[in-house]
Amino acid sequence: QYDIIWVDWNNGTDYIQKNAYVLEEVIKWINAEKLANGSSQSNVVLGASMGGLIARYALKDMEDRGIPTQTSLYISHDAPHQGANFPIGYQYMSRHALHQYVKSPALLLGGEVIMPLFTDGVTPLDLLLLQNTPAARQMLINYVGINYGITNTAHDTWQNELRIKGYPSMRKIAISNGNHCAITQNASAGASLLSIDGNYSTGWFTDIVLTTFPGVNTGIFKSLA
């Protein structure tokens, strides 16, 4: 008999270290609860995707600081220990979509005011800005910024810290969602994966708003940078 404890984050896209510190507090609480209830059962910590990085960092940080983890097994489920790859072309497409979205008052009105009423408050802008979050910048091997430039400083800094930190000492198991038979996807480097040719405009309404309020786009992009 055992208990399953699921850990969720108020801000799952925050810095990986911050959520690792939260996990440390959870592990300490679990160990205190076990002690209070006379249990000596060791913990098994499983982290999926980015959660695998959070768990690795938390367990090793506790060991480094001499805090007992009471953990016998760490399971890394498809975690990007060497970094995450999101095709640069898709990132550029996402950035272009963001630029077009904020230039369209009609879309902004529908997406940021009306749509959240039916999507638990989530807006298209929230999704288009996921690339900007601290965790995304830390994990992405190549990160395309708001102005289309590639900057990997956050990733390089994080990977160096993670490499120096190393792995916790308990038994470790890694699970990957990749193909176990090493069969490739027949996509060569630089190949075109998606191509779209077309255009769209909100026409006169956008022209009126941008003419009346010429600084609206500048203000939006300053707030996103």
Describe each PLM feature range.
Residues 9-25:
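Catalytic nucleophile-loop/oxyanion-hole region of alpha/beta-hydrolase
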Residues 7, 77, 175:
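Short glycine/serine/threonine-enriched helix-capping/active-site loop
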Residues 1-6:
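Short, surface-exposed "cap/lid" segments of acyl-processing enzymes
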